[in-house]
C-alpha cells in the first residue's frame, strides 16, 4: 500500500502556523524589551532621587560612595564618565576624582627617587591621606583605584599590578610583562629576590631570570645588592617597607615641585 504525499495545502498551512508563531514570539520579545526598558528608566529615576537625597553622604563617606557606584554600575551608569555630566554636577564626583588624581601624581613623583615608580596601594593611601589633612574629604583605597584607572585611560603611564592580596601602583611608563609581574609577586614576602629563588620557585632557566631582573634594574624598579650573603639580592624598594614608610619630607616635596 502506497503512502500519499503531503499536499500543497498542508504545506501552506504549516508555513502559516510557523509564521504566526514567529510573529507572536517577536511581539513577546518586544514586550519584554519595553518592560525592561521601563524598569531601567524607573530605576535610574529612583537612583537620581537617591543621589540627590544622599549627596553629602556619597561625597563624604567612602564606603557609601562605593555602594552607590556599584548601584550605578548595575544599569551601566558611570558617574566618572564625564566631568560635566548630570552625575558629576549633582555630586561633584568629577572634581573629586580629578583632584584625587592630581594628588596621586604628586605623591608618586615625590617618592619616585626612592621606589623607582612603584608603590603599594597601602603606602599610596597613607601618603595621600597625610597630604589631604584631617579636615579634608576622606578617601578610600577604592577611590584611589578608580582615580588611577582614569589616569591610566589618559595614557599617563599609570598601571595597577596585583601582588598577593594587594596592588602595586606603577607611575612610570615602563613596559612590564607577565614575567616581570610574577617576579614582583615573588618578591612580596621579603622585599627582594635572587636568581636562585626565581629558578627554584618558578622553574625558570638562569637566563630568563637574569633578563627579567636586568630589565627591572634598567627601569629603576629594583636595586642590586652585591654585598648580600650568598648571592646578589635584587631589592624592590616599593616592597621594602622600612625604606619608604617615613613621611615625605619638605625637602623631597620641594625637589619634586620646584
UniProtKB/Swiss-Prot annotation:
Matching SUPFAM superfamilies, A to Z?
Winged helix' DNA-binding domain (SSF46785)
Q: What disulfide bonds does the UniProt entry report for this chain?
A: none
Where is this protein chiefly located? cytoplasm
> What's this protein's function?
Component of the endosomal sorting complex required for transport II (ESCRT-II), which is required for multivesicular body (MVB) formation and sorting of endosomal cargo proteins into MVBs, and plays a role in autophagy. The MVB pathway mediates delivery of transmembrane proteins into the lumen of the lysosome for degradation. The ESCRT-II complex is probably involved in the recruitment of the ESCRT-III complex. The ESCRT-II complex may also play a role in transcription regulation by participating in derepression of transcription by RNA polymerase II, possibly via its interaction with ELL.
A GO molecular-function descriptor: channel regulator activity
Q: Which Pfam families match?
A: EAP30 (PF04157)
The scientific name of the source species is Mus musculus
Where does this protein have coiled-coil stretches? 27-53
The modified positions for Omega-N-methylarginine read 4
Where it sits in the cell: the answer is:
Cytoplasm; Endosome membrane; Nucleus; Late endosome membrane
Please give the Gene3D superfamilies that the UniProt record associates with this protein: 6.10.140.180, Winged helix-like DNA-binding domain superfamily/Winged helix DNA-binding domain
Q: Which BP terms does GO give this entry?
A: early endosome to late endosome transport; endocytic recycling; macroautophagy; multivesicular body assembly; multivesicular body sorting pathway; positive regulation of exosomal secretion; positive regulation of gene expression; positive regulation of protein catabolic process
Give the UniProt family note. Belongs to the SNF8 family.
A GO CC annotation recorded here is: nucleoplasm
Q: Which domain of life is it from?
A: Eukaryota
Q: Which keywords describe this protein according to UniProt?
A: Coiled coil, Cytoplasm, Endosome, Membrane, Methylation, Nucleus, Protein transport, Transcription, Transcription regulation, Transport
* Lineage, uppermost ranks: Eukaryota, Metazoa, Chordata, Craniata, Vertebrata
Question: Know the name of this protein?
Answer: Vacuolar-sorting protein SNF8
Amino acid at each position: 500500500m502506497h503512502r500519499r504525499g503531503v499536499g500543497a495545502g498542508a504545506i501552506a498551512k504549516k508555513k502559516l502556523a510557523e509564521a504566526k508563531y514567529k510573529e507572536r514570539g517577536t511581539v513577546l520579545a518586544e514586550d519584554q524589551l519595553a518592560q525592561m526598558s521601563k524598569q531601567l528608566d524607573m530605576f535610574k529615576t529612583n537612583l537620581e532621587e537617591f543621589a540627590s537625597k544622599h549627596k553629602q553622604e556619597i561625597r563624604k563617606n567612602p564606603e557609601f560612595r562605593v555602594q552607590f557606584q556599584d548601584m550605578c554600575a548595575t544599569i551601566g551608569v558611570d558617574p566618572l564618565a564625564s566631568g560635566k555630566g548630570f552625575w558629576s554636577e549633582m555630586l561633584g564626583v568629577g572634581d573629586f576624582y580629578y583632584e584625587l588624581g592630581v594628588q596621586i601624581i604628586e605623591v608618586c613623583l615625590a617618592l619616585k627617587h626612592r621606589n623607582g615608580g612603584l608603590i603599594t596601594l597601602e603606602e599610596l593611601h597613607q601618603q595621600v591621606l597625610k597630604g589631604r589633612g584631617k579636615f579634608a574629604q576622606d578617601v578610600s583605597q577604592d577611590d584611589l583605584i578608580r582615580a588611577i584607572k582614569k589616569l591610566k585611560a589618559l595614557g599617563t603611564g599609570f598601571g595597577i599590578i596585583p601582588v598577593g592580596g594587594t596592588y602595586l601602583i606603577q607611575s612610570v611608563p615602563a613596559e612590564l610583562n607577565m614575567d616581570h609581574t610574577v617576579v614582583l609577586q615573588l618578591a612580596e614576602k621579603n622585599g627582594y629576590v635572587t636568581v636562585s629563588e626565581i629558578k627554584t620557585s618558578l622553574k625558570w632557566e638562569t637566563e630568563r631570570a637574569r633578563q627579567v631582573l636586568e630589565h627591572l634594574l634598567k627601569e629603576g624598579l629594583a636595586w642590586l645588592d652585591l654585598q648580600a650573603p650568598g648571592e646578589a639580592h635584587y631589592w624592590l624598594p616599593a616592597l621594602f617597607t622600612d625604606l619608604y614608610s617615613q613621611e615625605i619630607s619638605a625637602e623631597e616635596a620641594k625637589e619634586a615641585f620646584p
